[in-house]
A protein has these predicted regions:
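Residue-level signal for the nucleotide or nucleotide-sugar donor/cofactor binding architecture
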Residues: 33, 65, 160-166, 192, ...
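NAD(P)H-binding glycine-rich loop region in Rossmannoid oxidoreductase-like domains
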Residues: 15-21, 25-72, 76-78, 91-99
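Alpha-helical membrane-targeting segments
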Residues: 136-162, 203, 208-246
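Short, amphipathic alpha-helical "lid/cap" segments that border enzyme active or binding sites
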Residues: 35, 39, 45, 71-74, ...
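Mid/C-terminal beta-alpha module of Rossmann-like enzyme folds, strongest
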Residues: 171-234, 248-274
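Residues in the short beta-alpha loop(s) of Rossmann-like NAD(P)-binding domains
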Residues: 13-14, 190
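Oxidoreductase cofactor-interface core, primarily capturing Rossmann-like NAD(P)-dependent enzymes
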Residues: 3, 20, 96-205
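Conserved Rossmann-fold NAD(P)-dependent oxidoreductase catalytic core, especially the SDR/UDP-sugar
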Residues: 6-8, 47, 53-54, 68-127
Length: 274
């Protein structure tokens, strides 16, 4: 797809800027929780892609960054005559789940703000996004390489539909150009259980460590303690979300774009090769 113009990335700190070293984009400082910092960030932009989120913290943190942050940037975007908006939400976000955990509540409120904004928009709800640099797969790979057993939460029958990060990036770019509108739920080409995901990951790593299923009731009290850490490995809210499925209802909206979506085994091979 031909693309014109320049990508501008808003970062809060030198650390954020360093992570984009070598990426072809302009950098601008800003913080979605500081409305006054956003005017320069969106000035002259045709489209805004909202990727800001937190995955652990207090309810007020989720609201401040995800929900209110979206409102703040929407206000700046409208004032700057931005013509299009792409919102990165999360699969599982629905009216019926908004009171389940603060994360879903904040994501839902952010979606509602976008829907009410009057801007042409696309709201993306991906399943787990897999990639080589950070995120879930490197964490799982470290466990599979180092732990004596593979800790699987619950029965392991909960389903997920991982999608490769480059596929998501292409979909974001196409939505920013106006190819698709509205709500899009995105998954990769394979729907698997957590049991199967771990089995495939072990195959990719060449390890045969045995599985150990940990009931949610057993892990939840430990999560209470872990939540006191600066970057907890798991929280009670995350356990609540992991108890359910995370696959899209058919049809998979990712198929609208005609992309050769990366199969799960290839996703895992790429992610563990780095």
């Amino acid at each position: 797809m031909p693309r014109a113009g320049t990508v501008r990335a808003m970062v809060r700190s030198d650390k954020g800027a360093a992570r984009l070293a070598g990426v072809e984009c302009d950098l601008v400082r800003g913080d979605v929780t500081d409305p006054e910092s956003l005017q320069a960030a969106v000035a002259g932009c045709n489209a805004v892609v909202y990727l800001v989120a937190v995955i652990a913290g207090r309810a007020s943190d989720f609201d401040r960054v995800i929900a209110q942050g979206t409102r703040n940037l929407l206000e700046a975007a409208r004032a700057a005559d931005v013509r299009r908006w792409v919102q990165m939400s999360a699969l599982g976000t629905r009216r019926t789940t908004k009171d389940l955990v603060p994360y879903f509540h904040a994501k839902w409120e952010a979606e509602e703000a976008v829907r009410a904004s009057g801007l042409p928009h696309a709201i993306l709800r991906p399943s787990f996004v897999f990639g080589p640099d950070g995120g879930l797969v490197p964490r799982l790979a470290r466990i599979a390489r180092l732990a004596p057993v593979i800790p699987i939460l619950g029965p392991g029958t909960q389903r997920l539909q991982p999608i490769w990060v480059d596929d998501v990036a292409e979909i974001v770019a196409r939505c920013a150009s106006g190819e698709q509108n509205g709500l899009l739920e995105l998954g990769g080409p394979d729907v698997v259980s957590w049991n199967e995901l771990w089995a495939r990951l072990k195959t990719a790593l060449g390890t045969r460590r045995p599985d150990l299923h940990l009931p949610f009731w057993f892990v939840r009290p430990q999560a209470v303690v872990l939540e006191r850490l600066p970057n907890p490995p798991v929280t009670r809210d995350q356990l609540t979300m992991l108890e359910g499925d995370d696959n899209v209802a058919e049809p998979n909206d990712a198929l609208r774009f005609g992309l050769p979506l990366v199969p799960l085994d290839e996703q895992l091979r790429r992610a563990v090769a780095t």
